[in-house]
């Protein structure tokens, strides 16, 4: 559910803004001066919407649009080709997304894991950035509805809205420069806030826009999504090169650094994980970076519980008579004292008979090699057994190595460890450096990639009121005018394509919202 406090703040804030605006406009003393102030500053206020427009940046836009004319011509030609391809590809992408959503709705147990754009999704900002790289732990769709407070953590709103605003500004800069390049008058640039979503816009002289050729219009209309696509590519490049960029201050490849442990995490405790710990192994799985951490947890979660070699003498010394019984899930329990330190283990004796024994977990698994069967233990000692923790179906005992501290023994679902422990691959070279800085940068870049890419895809959809509508109209004018002489037929074709795109997008948004809010 959306946090009530967030709703109260948003609704309360807009109520104050709107009532203040209404009172000032109704006041005999302040009406004219207030309206003059709004007009002079390019401000307009309506319910849940604030809009600011300025001509301050016009000179900069004209400078950019008239510089290196030949290069810009080729640049926006590439953008035009990309825009047309993206417009038609969006049908396939939306159709695929709709099928995925319907498949999830039909499933008995829809996947409970979702991301941002790219996202990415977890309980804290740093865990989101570090864990979103694991595709195996998530059944992600290319497009997904994002609702703050539901599948977008409230503590990541700053990343989200900053990335939305930057993506919107870059999008509109593309339209503005392309328009000036095609000799369309540029009136101004602006920013708006709708409820909680920020955005940008450019004001172009409509008459000029209608007088230029369809191909010129295409360059202008495609420029926005083209710039968003390029921004997403630059974000991917920055993400790949981040270890190199931060190399003078941070190093990687030796493990993962703990940046945060949630208060409700099972990893909290005197012998648990702490901020600043360097994890090098999960069981016998080496961890050198975030991807290794995710893959190791994935393997541990979906493979049978691993065992530990123990000598016959140690087993005899530590074990004591117990009465085993079956749990509801069919697994066996043999520790009847509900101890936090003892765990029920199963093993096969020399006669291949399965036995159960209750052992102090730390003494049983410390300084031992891992195994699957007794044969794995015979290599080191002929009188050894492979003892395997007898736990509930989805529960695992995981030995987490974080030297120089003593190994942490974690008992629980691997995904709980995944979602309640925040990590980073970047280890500071100097003590004064923040361990959170690389995580903040990484998280923001991932949001920028996801949201800029999403803005390019969604705006390319031939849908009423989106860039795709104008791209489609210009494309039909450029290609069908000489083929179909009757403009009414051409307009009818365009209308049905727009109707199909609008219905497809609306279906995705509606079902996506239902899937997000119904979970």
UniProtKB/Swiss-Prot annotation:
It is found in: Membrane; Cytoplasm; Golgi apparatus membrane. The active site is at residue 172. It is an enzyme of class 3 (hydrolase). Residues 115-135 are annotated as: Disordered. Its EC number is 3.4.24.85. Residues 25-74, 108-144, 252-446, 477-492 are lumenal. It is a multi-pass membrane protein. It holds the Pfam family Peptidase_M50. Keywords: Cholesterol metabolism, Cytoplasm, Disease variant, Glycoprotein, Golgi apparatus, Hydrolase, Ichthyosis, Lipid metabolism, Membrane, Metal-binding, Metalloprotease, Osteogenesis imperfecta, Palmoplantar keratoderma, Protease, Steroid metabolism, Sterol metabolism, Transmembrane, Transmembrane helix, Zinc. Its main location: membrane. Residues 1-3, 514-519 are cytoplasmic. It catalyses: Cleaves several transcription factors that are type-2 transmembrane proteins within membrane-spanning domains. Known substrates include sterol regulatory element-binding protein (SREBP) -1, SREBP-2 and forms of the transcriptional activator ATF6. SREBP-2 is cleaved at the site 477-DRSRILL-|-CVLTFLCLSFNPLTSLLQWGGA-505. The residues Asn-Pro, 11 residues distal to the site of cleavage in the membrane-spanning domain, are important for cleavage by S2P endopeptidase. Replacement of either of these residues does not prevent cleavage, but there is no cleavage if both of these residues are replaced. Changing residue 171 to F: Loss of activity. Its cofactor is Zn(2+). Expressed in heart, brain, placenta, lung, liver, muscle, kidney and pancreas. Zn(2+) binds at residues 171, 175. Binds 1 zinc ion per subunit. Changing residue 475 to S: In IFAP1; does not affect subcellular localization; impairs activity. Belongs to the peptidase M50A family. This is Membrane-bound transcription factor site-2 protease. It comes from Homo sapiens (Human). The gene is MBTPS2.
């Amino acid at each position: 559910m959306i946090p009530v406090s967030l709703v109260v703040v948003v609704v309360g804030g807009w109520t104050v803004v709107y009532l203040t605006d209404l009172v000032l406009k109704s006041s005999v003393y302040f009406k004219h001066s207030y309206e003059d102030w709004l007009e002079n500053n390019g401000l307009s206020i309506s319910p849940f919407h604030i809009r600011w427009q300025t001509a301050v940046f016009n000179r900069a836009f004209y400078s950019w649009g008239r510089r290196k004319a030949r290069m810009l011509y080729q640049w926006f030609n590439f953008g035009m080709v990309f825009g047309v391809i993206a417009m038609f590809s969006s049908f396939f992408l939306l159709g695929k997304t709709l099928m995925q959503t319907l498949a999830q709705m039909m499933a008995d147990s829809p996947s409970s894991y979702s991301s941002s754009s790219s996202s990415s999704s977890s309980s804290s900002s740093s865990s989101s950035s570090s864990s979103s790289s694991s595709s195996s732990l998530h059944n992600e769709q290319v497009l997904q509805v994002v609702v703050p407070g539901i599948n977008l953590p409230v503590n990541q709103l700053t990343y989200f809205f900053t990335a939305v605003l930057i993506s919107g500004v870059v999008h509109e800069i593309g339209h503005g420069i392309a328009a000036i390049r095609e000799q369309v008058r540029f009136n101004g640039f602006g920013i708006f806030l709708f409820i909680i979503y920020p955005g940008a816009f450019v004001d172009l002289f409509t008459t000029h826009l209608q007088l230029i050729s369809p191909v010129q219009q295409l360059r202008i209309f495609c420029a926005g999504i083209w710039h968003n696509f390029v921004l997403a590519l630059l974000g991917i490049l920055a993400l790949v090169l981040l270890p190199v960029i931060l190399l003078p201050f941070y190093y990687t490849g030796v493990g993962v650094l703990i940046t945060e442990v949630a208060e409700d995490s099972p990893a909290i405790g005197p012998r648990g994980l702490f901020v600043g710990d360097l994890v090098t192994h999960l069981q016998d799985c080496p961890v050198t970076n975030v991807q290794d951490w995710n893959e190791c947890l994935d393997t541990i979660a979906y493979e049978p519980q691993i065992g530990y070699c123990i000598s016959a003498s140690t087993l005899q010394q530590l074990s004591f008579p117990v009465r085993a019984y079956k749990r509801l899930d069919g697994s066996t329990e043999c520790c009847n004292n509900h101890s936090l330190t003892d765990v029920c283990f199963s093993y096969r004796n020399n006669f291949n008979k399965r036995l159960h024994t209750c052992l102090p977990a730390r003494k049983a698994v410390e300084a031992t090699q891992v195994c699957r069967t007794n044969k794995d233990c015979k290599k080191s000692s002929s009188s050894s057994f492979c003892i395997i923790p007898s736990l509930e179906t989805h529960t695992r005992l995981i030995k987490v190595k974080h030297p120089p501290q003593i190994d942490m023994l974690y008992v629980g679902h691997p995904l709980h460890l995944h979602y309640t422990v925040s990590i980073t691959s970047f280890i500071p070279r100097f003590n004064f450096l923040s361990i959170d800085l690389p995580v903040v940068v990484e998280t923001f870049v991932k949001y920028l990639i996801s949201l800029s890419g999403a803005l390019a895809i969604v705006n390319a959809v031939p849908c009423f009121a989106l860039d795709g509508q104008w791209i489609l109209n210009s494309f039909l004018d450029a290609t069908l005018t000489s083929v179909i002489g009757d403009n009414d037929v051409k307009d009818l074709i365009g209308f049905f394509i727009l109707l199909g795109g609008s219905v497809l997008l609306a279906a995705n948004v509606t079902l996506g919202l239902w899937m997000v809010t119904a979970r």
